[in-house]
UniProtKB/Swiss-Prot annotation:
<feature type="compositionally biased region" description="Acidic residues">
    <location>
        <begin position="599"/>
        <end position="608"/>
    </location>
</feature>
<dbReference type="InterPro" id="IPR007484">
    <property type="entry name" value="Peptidase_M28"/>
</dbReference>
<feature type="transmembrane region" description="Helical; Name=3">
    <location>
        <begin position="470"/>
        <end position="490"/>
    </location>
</feature>
<feature type="binding site">
    <location>
        <position position="266"/>
    </location>
    <ligand>
        <name>Zn(2+) 1</name>
    </ligand>
</feature>
<keyword id="KW-0862">Zinc</keyword>
<feature type="glycosylation site" description="N-linked (GlcNAc...) asparagine">
    <location>
        <position position="147"/>
    </location>
</feature>
<feature type="transmembrane region" description="Helical; Name=6">
    <location>
        <begin position="561"/>
        <end position="581"/>
    </location>
</feature>
<feature type="transmembrane region" description="Helical; Name=4">
    <location>
        <begin position="494"/>
        <end position="514"/>
    </location>
</feature>
<feature type="binding site">
    <location>
        <position position="339"/>
    </location>
    <ligand>
        <name>Zn(2+) 2</name>
    </ligand>
</feature>
<feature type="active site" description="Proton acceptor">
    <location>
        <position position="240"/>
    </location>
</feature>
<dbReference type="GO" id="GO:0005774">
    <property type="term" value="C:vacuolar membrane"/>
</dbReference>
<protein>
    <recommendedName>
        <fullName>Vacuolar membrane protease</fullName>
        <ecNumber>3.4.-.-</ecNumber>
    </recommendedName>
</protein>
<feature type="region of interest" description="Disordered">
    <location>
        <begin position="596"/>
        <end position="623"/>
    </location>
</feature>
<feature type="glycosylation site" description="N-linked (GlcNAc...) asparagine">
    <location>
        <position position="937"/>
    </location>
</feature>
<dbReference type="InterPro" id="IPR053975">
    <property type="entry name" value="PFF1_C"/>
</dbReference>
<feature type="binding site">
    <location>
        <position position="241"/>
    </location>
    <ligand>
        <name>Zn(2+) 2</name>
    </ligand>
</feature>
<dbReference type="InterPro" id="IPR048024">
    <property type="entry name" value="Fxna-like_M28_dom"/>
</dbReference>
Amino acid sequence: MKLSNPFVFRPGPVSFWTTIVYLAIIIPLIYVQETVPPAPPEKDLPQGVNLTEAWLDLEVITRSYHPFNSHSNDIVRQYLVRRSRDILERNGIDYTTDLTGGVPWESRYLSSAEHPAQAAEASARPRGATLFDDRISNVTMTNPQPNDTMGRYFEGNNFYVYIHGSEDPEGDWWTSDNVQRVARNGAGVLVNCHFDSVSTGYGATDDGVACVSLLQLLSHFTSKGHQPKNGIVLLFNNAEEDGLLGAKAFGYSPLVQFCNTLVNLEGAGAGGRAMLFRTTDLEAAEAYSKSPHPFGSVVASNAFERGVIKSGTDYSVFVDNYGQRGLDIAFYSPRSRYHTEEDDARHTSVDSIWHMLSAALATTESLARTTSTKFNGPRSDGRKDLVQSGRPTAGVWFDWYGSSWSAFSLRGLFAWTLTLLITTPIVLFVVTYVLVRDDKWYFFATRVDSSVGDGEETVSFGGWKGFVRFPFALVVATALTIGSVFLLAKVNPLIIYSSGYSVWAMMLSLFYFVSWLLLRGAHFVRPSALQRGFTLIWLFIITWVLSVFAAVAEDRMNMGAVYSLAFLHTLVFAAVLISLLEQYALPAKQDFARQLSGENEEGEEQEQENLSGDGGNEQNHEDRGEADIAAAPTETTPLRADEEGQGSSEQTTTFANTYRRPVPETRGATHSGNNRKRSFPPYENEQAWSGRLPTWTWFIQLLLLVPLYVTVLGNLALVQTTSMGMTGTDGSSLLVPLMGVGILTILLLLPLTPFIHRVSHHVPLFLLLVFIGTLIYNLTAFPFSANNRFKFYFKQVVDLDKGSNVVTLNGLEKFVRPVIGSLPTPAGQRIHCDEDPFLSNLRNCQYDASLLPPDVANGEKLENLISFEASKSKNGKTVLVSLDALNTRVCFLDTSSPIFGFSVDGGAKRDDRFGSFPPEGLQQIQLWRRDWEKGWNVTLYLGGNVLPTNQDSVEATEVDEVDDDPSGGELKRRAVREFVVTARCAWSDVNSANTIPAFHEVKQFMPRWAIVAKKSVGLVEITKKIKVT
């Protein structure tokens, strides 16, 4: 039995191979997205790394909530310091503890050596490690965000371990008189985590996994034979969750200028894989390539740079404010557990620890081995006040199925794109010219003079058939797909929160079915062997135009995120080239026309012989002969051949619904001598000449267009859905995640369109059923579940002056109201919801909570919690504020009118690295302290629109407070006399249910599909006002 060709361009093979190829790509991509690579056995781990130990450390760290403003935070800090000491001692490393930090650089040492003589000797040579226990650093700054008039004073308590490198400066170089010069000669690597959590989360992945990874890095790099060439600083910073404050306090360390490179470990999800969020340059991305399971792309980096992703991490401080180069590695999913009680050890795994740890270890090893000027030397921006980290190279990087890594320069991508823009049209033009010269250019061919016999006859080639089908189908399919996006956004936009794959199934099935219906329908009505080639030509035109914009983005905007277009352009060009070269298998058009006319004449003679017994009806024979060589049907040709058409136009249209086949398809096929014709029959009434085209080249085109491009883009598509699908409850746009799916659906299925008209009806009809089912589900299903919980935000405010106690639940009003309806306390109250001033999609819904007063200081009355005094100086230029509060580290000062300078007793001058002083002044100051009992003495400087100097923010220039204008002078004097200062102190420790009963009521009674997170720094704020006259 003869087996059929499995690669022929027929419905069966096309349906099979297109489905198999797409599934073979998409299923592994989904698997990579949804799973974490298993950790290796203990025997295969790098020396010094112990995952069992790391897991136990994580369980200890996440036993309780441990925000900066909690006593548990101190316990976690002590544990990490003790574990660091234990590791150093276990590995036999001499180390000292440096109690410096802040300014001035005064230090004392506590040596781990048993004898003072040994300690003295160790100070003269490179020590194994130094532990910096910083309880001195403080920073005064203004918030760098626009339209945010806020000042901050922060007292840090970071600690960090400096592992001395074999090529580092000798001795305790940071104590030398010329510390800056010595530091800048180094090439240290900073690896950072933060050990505080939010007040509503246990901080397993944000950022406990990172901190236990640092402990394992400490163990590895202090093991025998693993001392790095360049020193490594392992920073455990505090108070990241409340404004990246620990990283800013590190700016006063003498090691800042020493660390040229950075590996920041973070968590913006709660488990899964740790993704390379962003990097500064190509060299850093190449260092990451040593990771055994790389995961990420340049798209995320570009999204951060353009403000599409607004999540802030310590990375921005180290890179933007200090000038270091490096990477930001972070967990990114699932977002619904981020900053909630589900960010715990139960919802992560040892595999997740290994994924982050292995990436950090490989990257740190690579950076610590660098001895050239790759990360050292003058900066490209010429700034001398930042770390002299060399000249970075803009790059492009992405992973392949989470197992391999590609990284190359952005200039290389631009050169690639530019080469495609210039060379591909030229190559196609040359090939087309040769085809025209050889009379084998069948595209756009209309009629050819056969020049056979006594009369002049022309043969139609149907070279325009199928030309406009693809753009028409693309426009309609795109419109319907984008329309479905807006439909979902209108009816049930948050369905992507829990059912992202359902949204993908709906979009993909809709675009596929509509494209097939239109393209297959057009081919059925008017078959054309050129449809695949025309579709590829249109794809080439589209990708060429898009590549123009991509080249501008790459060259002018330094955007590497468009790299997938270079792949698509290259592959489409190759596929078009194959379609052109296919025509060399065809005879010259003139030869085919002559052959066709010759066969027609033979057919007529044979027919006359066969019909000679009919009484010599020559007129009928003559009429049939004329019909056989007639021109191809026109747009006025009737539906049935025996009906008359109207008009005289001879031009055909793409979707004309009749087609008169050339003579060889009818008469020639019955001629006994037409053996050649019988060897190359056309498919389904396509053009007669098309039977000579190769039937297997489509499969090569499929393999060119689909696997590589869909792999690159499909990975980005899944990451986009996972990272953005759950941001709607955070106040982000509800439309953007859905629109991303819609646009990526179109881009993913574009490579299929040249072949889709050959797909049998079974696949699209199945997808039609999928579309109907998923559409109904997506429009009607409740978007949240116990595994994908609706996130809302809690805050309680007690106003001592008004005697009020109000709880605010912030979130999407449609879902916040049912949460409030499930609580006992607000029952019967009229709930009013106001628009959030910062996030327009969210609402602040409030209810009276007087029955649930907080107990934040072991039974102390609320009115006794805050000690607050304020008075104006004799000259009226300043206001002196004395503020203290029980059992908290955080208080705010709000002023009724702007101030133009402030200082805190014992604090440093304002640091210009973190923002300039706003010309309009400040009306809020945040005050943070490292201990629990020392109060704040703050001086507020009054005045006009005068910007304090960068060197001393506490000096403000006096301006006239009273205008000479009699109509306004009295009001201004009254405003000055009634200067009001409001103290707001915050409490965040909810490890005991009795501390903030209103919060625990919410946790106890909220629906299973909802989960609570913090709204601001404190879960409870208590306020008190003073009028200063």
